[in-house]
Amino acid sequence: MGVMINHHFLAFIFGILGNVISFLVFLAPVPTFYRIYKRKSTESFQSLPYQVSLFSCMLWLYYALIKKDAFLLITINSFGCVVETLYIAMFFAYATREKRISAMKLFIAMNVAFFSLILMVTHFVVKTPPLQVSVLGWICVAISVSVFAAPLMIVARVIKTKSVEYMPFTLSFFLTISAVMWFAYGLFLNDICIAIPNVVGFVLGLLQMVLYLVYRNSNEKPEKINSSEQQLKSIVVMSPLGVSEVHPVVTESVDPLSEAVHHEDLSKVTKVEEPSIENGKCYVEATRPETV
């Protein structure tokens, strides 16, 4: 009995630590969305990482609610649902019409339709509570592990370019620590569904830190990339319980005129005609493009 109490106490301690670190992880994109708010444009940012994170938080929150003894899992994923919803709402508000429609389609397909399907299957098809917990837990594991394609892509990019520009050591370190906290939480709760994704997260985080130490003094220049990638770099974020995100972070300032061409309606860009000479005088005419 004493061992069980000790295990629950340790689970509580690691759960608290996991909550603190994950709380900071969820707030990592705040500078991104402050930039979006100030510029009234989503620029080259995408909604996919935030929608995937919201979907993950919804699944883990549902899992924690039916499991009934995972309060610390409820707290962090409730916070995650609120924060990611705010991020997505701001993205909808400032995205172009085309990007907004695309993001809304993804939101309806993944966070409404797919989540509703999982909800109905686990609630109406699977009747017994223990089996519900087991089925939903393995669904969470499968989805959490599957999205590790993103950090693997960043690892491949670092090896290819021999540059750690896209993989800050500090972020990789704290995310690895987060994986350790949640792994220990799952271990002491004897919940393999919580522990497994964080084993993968720990291994990938450790790999990222090793690569950083190997390539941090490399003199290799990153290969040339397109203009949108020059403006932004991809930061891999392991969310609580093994879900990964790619948060774009500004790397350099963008020329206002080129930004207008890339992100704004063409009607906002004036067209300068070639100078003409008439009666010994030079004329330069600025005209707006014709609207259809």
Curated annotation (Swiss-Prot):
Q: State which ranges are Extracellular (membrane side).
A: 1-8, 67-70, 127-134, 190-193
Q: What is its main location?
A: membrane
Q: Oligomeric state and partners?
A: Forms heterooligomers with SWEET1, SWEET6, SWEET8, SWEET11 and SWEET17.
Residue spans crossing the bilayer: 9-29, 46-66, 71-91, 106-126, 135-155, 169-189, 194-214
Return the similarity comment.
Belongs to the SWEET sugar transporter family.
Q: What does it do? A: Mediates both low-affinity uptake and efflux of sugar across the plasma membrane. Regulates cell viability under high salinity. Promotes senescence and sensitivity to salt stress. Contributes to seed filling by triggering sucrose efflux involved in the transfer of sugars from seed coat to embryos.
Which segments sit on the Cytoplasmic face? 30-45, 92-105, 156-168, 215-292
The protein's name is: Bidirectional sugar transporter SWEET15
Provide the MtN3/slv domain boundaries: 12-99, 135-219
Q: Which InterPro entries match?
A: SWEET (IPR047664), SWEET_rpt (IPR004316)
Q: Which organism is it from?
A: Arabidopsis thaliana (Mouse-ear cress)
Alphabetically sorted, this entry's keywords are: Cell membrane, Developmental protein, Golgi apparatus, Membrane, Repeat, Sugar transport, Transmembrane, Transmembrane helix, Transport
What's a Pfam family this protein contains? Answer: MtN3_slv
Q: In which tissues is it expressed?
A: Accumulates in leaves during senescence, in a SA-independent manner. Expressed in the lateral roots and in flowers. Expressed in developing seeds.
Cell compartments where the protein resides: Cell membrane; Golgi apparatus membrane
Q: Which GO terms describe its biological process?
A: cellular response to abscisic acid stimulus; cellular response to osmotic stress; cellular response to salicylic acid stimulus; embryo development ending in seed dormancy; leaf senescence; seed maturation; sucrose transport
> What is the consequence of disrupting this locus?
Reduced sensitivity to high salinity. In plants lacking SWEET11, SWEET12 and SWEET15, severe seed defects, which include retarded embryo development, reduced seed weight, and reduced starch and lipid content, causing a wrinkled seed phenotype. Altered sucrose efflux involved in the transfer of sugars from seed coat to embryos thus leading to starch accumulation in the seed coat but not in the embryo.
Q: Which GO terms describe its molecular function?
A: sucrose transmembrane transporter activity; sugar transmembrane transporter activity
Gene assigned in the entry:
SWEET15
Q: What induces it?
A: Induced by the pathogenic bacteria P.syringae pv. tomato and the fungal pathogen B.cinerea, as well as by salicylic acid (SA) and abscisic acid (ABA). Induced by osmotic stresses (e.g. cold, high salinity, drought, mannitol, and sorbitol) via an abscisic acid-dependent pathway. Highly induced during senescence. Triggered by NAC072/RD26 during senescence.
Membrane-protein topology:
Multi-pass membrane protein
- One GO cellular component term noted in the UniProt record for this chain: plasma membrane
